[in-house]
Amino acid sequence: MKQMQKRIINISSYKKPSVWKKVKSFTAFSIIAVMLLGITPMLSTYAAEQNYYKWDISPEKIDLVDLSAYFDGYEGSFVLYNLKSDTWSIYDIDHATLRTSPNSTYKIYDALFGLEEDIITPKDSFMTWNGTDYPFEAWNANHNLYSAMDSSVNWYFQEIDRQLGTSALKNYMKKIGYGNENIDSGLSFYWMQSTLKISPVEQVQLLTDLYNNNFDFAPENVNAVKDSICLLSSYRKSFYGKTGTGRVNGQDVNGWFVGFVEIDENTYFFTTNIQSNSNATGRNATEITKSILSDLNIWEY
């Protein structure tokens, strides 16, 4: 009864808003709406900028090349750095500076961190398989650095991360400047179509820094990582590389191949990234890379 009386009193005491009050309310609403509309594109622009690498380089050092014929059915880019001449050849500069998940190409640096922390060593990198049934037969076995890199064994590198811990991993990310350095999605998944992202240009820069040991890591550790990604070696020529494939909803949408070629007195560093709704695999990125390098007379197949 008291509640009913209170409601009646409130209704009887209600006064219709004046025209001026309505105008003030509408004006305030309009200002807020305009502010929100103004902020939204700013936030979108900021997010977009975060996805791109801000590359500070003289345009004279870059040769923009048309390699679209090699990328039939794919979006993506090819980046080549000539160490001797300090020059770049790039197909699709927009995609070359676009950051995306590194997937298994990141294992190059994860191995390096594990070596630096003595989780593994150049002489003893053996890890025992824990018996978990993995989707690839090659993963269901014991591994060392070389076999794990060759078969791209996820659990091997996840174990390195587990022993490293988040704090140490973040410090290493910052030390080498790995892409956006974001591992917030967790130690098991951050490099697999998740929060960690890097551009093709940055991939080449990091490979160059690794090759020259600009990180000032133990030389034997750097050499161990180089050896683990050596694919072919012959007199006066060596070919190094690592693939990566990103899968979303059962489809391969993000393919990588990164590496370098040593020839006589020069070294060429490369990255190929392909993206599509399907079939964008590291293997297909590798085939594209081989065709380009062959046509450039850098490596014959």
Language model: regions and residue ranges:
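Hydrophobic topogenic segments
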Residues: 1-48
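Short, well-structured active-site flanking segments
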Residues: 115-132, 218-222
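Active-site helix/loop module of the DD-peptidase/beta-lactamase fold
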Residues: 126-147, 173-181
